[in-house]
Structure formats: C-alpha cells, structure tokens
Amino acid sequence: MNPTETKFNQDMRNIYVTAKEDLGYTASRFMQLVSQKGGLQAARQLILKEGGTYGFEVLWENKRLDLSVEALVLQPEYESLFSDEERMLCRNRLEEFGYF
C-alpha cells in the first residue's frame, strides 16, 4: 500500500469514528467492509452500489455529506486513486443531494 492509499484507508476509518461521535450513527457494516477489503476497495464497492447506501442517506438526513465516501473520494489528494468515472459518480451523487 502506497502512502496515499494508507492515508485514504485511515480517512475511511475516520468517517466511521466521526459519524459515531457526531451523529451517534454506528456504521458497523461500513467498518466491517473497510476492515475486510481495505479503504480503497471498500470505497469502490460503495460508490458503485446502485441506488447508494443507507449510510449516505443517514449522512444526508443529518446534513453531513462531508462525511460521505463520495466527498472523500473527491478530495484532490486522492484523485490518483480513482478513475474519472468513479469520481464523476461521486460528484453526480453529491450534486443530486445538494452537497454542491
């Protein structure tokens, strides 16, 4: 794992911690997926999921899409980890839900 992937993996774990602390939302399946597949593969699986995820819905309802995997994927420091198509999916989903 290169340094960028390592940092991304840690930031994925931080999503779980922050959502739990700030919202009282325990995203057990999310953390299980990150632990099993690593942050990068977990993110790819989640962003490609048709119809989005329950966790995204919880974050949207609480006006915290800044904690979404989609928002993390779009951070400039992680551009090299994802394809243009993956990043476009994230941007489109966030735009659809009023993040931008």
What function would you assign to each model-found segment?
Residues 2-3, 58-61, 90:
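Non-catalytic interaction surface on structured domains
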Residues 6, 10, 28, 40-41, ...:
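Generic alpha-helical secondary structure signal
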Residues 63-100:
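Amphipathic alpha-helical binding modules
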Residues 11-13, 25, 51-54, 67, ...:
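Accessory DNA-engaging acidic/polar modules
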Residues 1-22, 96:
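Charged, compositionally biased N-terminal leader segments and the immediate start
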Residues 16-64:
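Amphipathic alpha-helical packing elements
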Residues 1, 9, 23, 49, ...:
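Short linear sequence motifs
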Residues 1, 14-18, 29-30, 43-45, ...:
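Charged, low-complexity surface segments at secondary-structure and domain boundaries
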